[in-house]
């Protein structure tokens, strides 16, 4: 590099200019702005300052000529920075003045570069070496003055390089200086790039935010709340709907303190001004993507999975992944994505949209791919509620997420969501309608012991009850995504939605299936008990769900209750009507006298028949306490008055003592006690009716 030692006077002349900033060639629009600020007044001031600055030098020359040793003038990076700040406008002015002549003649004349420029570069290089020497790198950016000093020095080097590279005389005569300055600039930018990465990774602080997941809160508050790792379980053997607890949750966004954001923004500005904006952006993009994914994994247990991986998952595994997906999608929509947009805006103002999209767009597409993959898995009834959960999450949370993206990406994401929701909706409809097919195909020939509620009834009603907890969503799904043709079916009743009509169709099929299964019992009374058990269970489930009751209506419930009363009457007639026949007077009187042999036989027949009824019907099952009580009360109301009247009328004709004990096995109170033992599902080996004899 050619040192500036040819003409001291030329050095003085080169410094006549304003004190101001000059921007690099990467930003020509700013050059014009600063050039407008140049004035002759400023040039004179700087020129005078330079003249004054040379006086000590002249004295030193005289002293040297007289054999005296000149005192050393200590130059610091700060003092040289001030001199460079005064010189840069001069160089900028020279570049502008000779721009036209350069274009016309291909030359702009020789321009002297002061010696302090090289000295400044040397001292700045020493400063960089100090930072690279192994000392803690966190020190400098925690000190505001050090941050300002370093970044201003970097900015001066970038401005100097921009002017040198755009001034032909400098390119022609100061190649060595340009190479030296360029090397230092590259080193400085590499240092800032590393520091930007370190600060980005190591200065993350978690900002706690409380969010309320109130989606479906009304639905879930009405369902039975029990601890379970899965979201929904519909059991064929139990009456529980297992759903998760919901409410306020505290989630943490991986952000930065304000002072750290300021440092990151300043570094980004200086790197961009020096022509290294792309490198800074890349560091930011990679860093924030990693931080975001790490946070989602640690706090939400979310991990990226491909469509192929989703489709290969067992349902047990996928069932655990779906609630994680739902929570992560909601958290990204309400906190993480808005946080990323705000952070990009604070560090890269004016370019936040592009950076935000690059950080989050891939994750958004991953979310939607998961949803579509779930919809494409093999259909089964237990998947319905998980699929509806995903559908609701997309429906309720995507609009807020969508608004964060620019229009061109917004349209793409909207199309992806529409596609995913369509697949989910169609799958949900098929699964719900598969319940109809499962009822039709259930042809089990083994009757349920004791006439209890059939597992198909329990499963279907639990399924329908919880389905109706999603009633609004299912109504929307059937309306928006149903492509099923039912030309062979009767038209939908006026005023009923497609979902309501499908639900009523399922109820009709269940009724018909139960009627068929009741015929599997050879004992007609037990068949009646079976229909009463299942009918009461259905009615109670419907009355216990406002949503399903709204669909089925009061008329349906009244009609079903009437059918239950008919089964009750049939049971009572078939069982207790025969027993009441033994308590009649016919055949016991002849010519006004009691026929004792007939009376004794009548008591024996009554006892044997009652014992058989008791033995059999204590094994029958009526789990509904109200129905069990109603049956016992109605039996007691019929049997006890009749038996008590029969005993009062004919018991006196049996001889007291052994004869009475032999034929009068039960007192009315004993009969009442034994009736209260019916329908307990008692399968013990005892076949003898026992009751405490009352005296």
UniProtKB/Swiss-Prot annotation:
Phosphorylation on Ser and Thr residues promotes its ability to repress pollen tube growth and to regulate cellular architecture at the pollen tube tip. It is found in: Cytoplasm. Changing residue 215 to D: Phospho-mimetic (PM) mutant with constitutive inhibitory effects on pollen tube growth. Its main location: cytoplasm. Keywords: Cytoplasm, Exocytosis, Phosphoprotein, Protein transport, Transport. Transmembrane segments: none annotated. GO terms for biological process: exocytosis; protein transport; regulation of pollen tube growth. One of its GO terms (molecular function) is phosphatidylinositol-4,5-bisphosphate binding. GO terms for cellular component: cytoplasm; cytosol; exocyst; nucleus; pollen tube. Residues 1-71, 210-229 are annotated as: Disordered. Changing residue 446 to E: Phospho-mimetic (PM) mutant with constitutive inhibitory effects on pollen tube growth. Disruption phenotype: Partial male-specific transmission defect due to aberrant pollen tube growth. Residues 1-36 have a biased composition (Basic and acidic residues). Changing residue 217 to A: Phospho-dead (PD) mutant with reduced inhibitory effects on pollen tube growth. The modification Phosphothreonine is found at residues 212, 446. Changing residue 494 to A: Phospho-dead (PD) mutant with reduced inhibitory effects on pollen tube growth. Interacts with ROH1A and ROH1D independently of its phosphorylation status. This is Exocyst complex component EXO70C2. It comes from Arabidopsis thaliana (Mouse-ear cress).
């Amino acid at each position: 590099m050619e040192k500036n030692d040819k003409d001291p006077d030329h050095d003085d002349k080169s410094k006549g200019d304003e004190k101001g900033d000059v921007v690099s060639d990467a930003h020509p629009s700013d050059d014009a702005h600063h050039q407008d600020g140049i004035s002759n007044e400023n040039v004179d001031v700087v020129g005078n300052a330079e003249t004054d600055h040379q006086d000590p030098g002249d004295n030193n020359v005289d002293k040297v000529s007289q054999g005296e040793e000149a005192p050393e003038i200590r130059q610091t990076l700060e003092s040289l920075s001030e001199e460079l700040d005064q010189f840069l406008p001069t160089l900028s002015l020279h570049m502008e003045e000779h721009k036209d002549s350069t274009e016309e003649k291909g030359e702009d004349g020789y321009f002297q570069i002061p010696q302090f420029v090289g000295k400044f570069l040397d001292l700045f290089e020493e400063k960089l070496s100090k930072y690279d020497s192994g000392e803690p790198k966190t020190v400098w950016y925690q000190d505001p003055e050090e941050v300002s000093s370093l970044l201003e020095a970097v900015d001066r080097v970038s401005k100097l390089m921009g002017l040198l590279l755009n001034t032909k005389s400098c390119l022609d005569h100061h190649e060595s200086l340009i190479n030296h300055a360029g090397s230092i600039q590259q080193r400085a930018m590499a240092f800032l790039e590393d520091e930007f990465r370190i600060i980005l990774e190591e200065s993350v602080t978690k900002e706690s935010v409380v969010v309320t997941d109130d989606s479906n809160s009304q639905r879930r508050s009405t369902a039975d709340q029990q601890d379970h790792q899965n979201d929904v379980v519909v059991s064929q053997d139990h009456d529980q709907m297992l759903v998760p607890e919901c409410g306020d949750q505290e989630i943490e966004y991986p952000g930065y303190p304000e002072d750290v954001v300021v440092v990151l923004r300043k570094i980004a500005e200086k790197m961009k001004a020096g022509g290294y904006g792309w490198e800074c952006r890349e560091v930011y993009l990679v860093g924030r993507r990693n931080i975001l994914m790490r946070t989602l994994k640690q706090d939400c247990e979310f991990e990226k999975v491909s469509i192929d991986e989703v489709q290969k998952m067992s349902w047990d595994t996928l069932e655990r992944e779906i609630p994680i997906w739902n929570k992560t999608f909601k958290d990204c929509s309400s906190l993480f994505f808005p946080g990323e947009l705000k952070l990009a805006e604070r560090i890269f103002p004016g370019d936040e949209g592009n950076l935000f999209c690059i950080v989050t767009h891939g994750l958004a597409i991953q979310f939607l791919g998961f949803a579509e993959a779930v919809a494409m898995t093999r259909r089964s009834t237990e998947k319905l509620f998980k699929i509806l959960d995903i559908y609701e999450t997309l429906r309720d949370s995507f609009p807020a997420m969508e608004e964060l993206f620019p229009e061109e990406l917004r349209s793409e994401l909207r199309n992806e969501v529409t596609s995913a929701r369509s697949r989910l909706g169609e799958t949900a409809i098929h699964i719900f309608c598969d319940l109809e097919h499962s009822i039709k195909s259930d042809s089990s020939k083994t009757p349920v012991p004791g006439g209890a509620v059939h597992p198909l009834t329990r499963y279907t009603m639990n399924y329908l009850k919880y389905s109706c907890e999603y009633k609004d969503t299912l109504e929307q799904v059937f309306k928006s995504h149903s492509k099923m043709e039912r030309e062979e079916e009767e038209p939908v009743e006026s005023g009923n939605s497609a979902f309501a009509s499908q639900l009523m169709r399922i109820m009709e099929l269940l009724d018909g299936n139960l009627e068929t299964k009741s015929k599997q019992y050879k004992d007609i009374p037990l068949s009646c008990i079976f229909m009463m058990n299942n009918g009461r269970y259905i009615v109670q489930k419907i009355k216990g769900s406002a949503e399903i009751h709204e669909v089925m209506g009061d008329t349906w419930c009244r009609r079903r209750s009437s059918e239950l009363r008919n089964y009750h009457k049939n049971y009572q007639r078939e069982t207790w009507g025969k027993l009441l026949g033994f308590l009649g007077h016919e055949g016991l009187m002849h010519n006004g006298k009691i026929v004792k042999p007939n009376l004794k036989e009548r008591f024996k027949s009554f006892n044997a028949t009652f014992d058989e009824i008791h033995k059999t019907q204590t094994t029958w099952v009526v789990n509904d306490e109200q129905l069990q009580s109603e049956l016992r009360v109605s039996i007691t109301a019929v049997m006890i008055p009749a038996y008590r009247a029969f005993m009062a009328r004919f018991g006196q004709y049996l001889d007291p003592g052994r004869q009475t004990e032999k034929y009068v096995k039960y007192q009315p109170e004993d009969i009442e006690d034994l009736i209260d033992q019916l329908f307990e599902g008692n399968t013990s080996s005892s076949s003898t009716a026992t009751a405490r004899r009352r005296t």
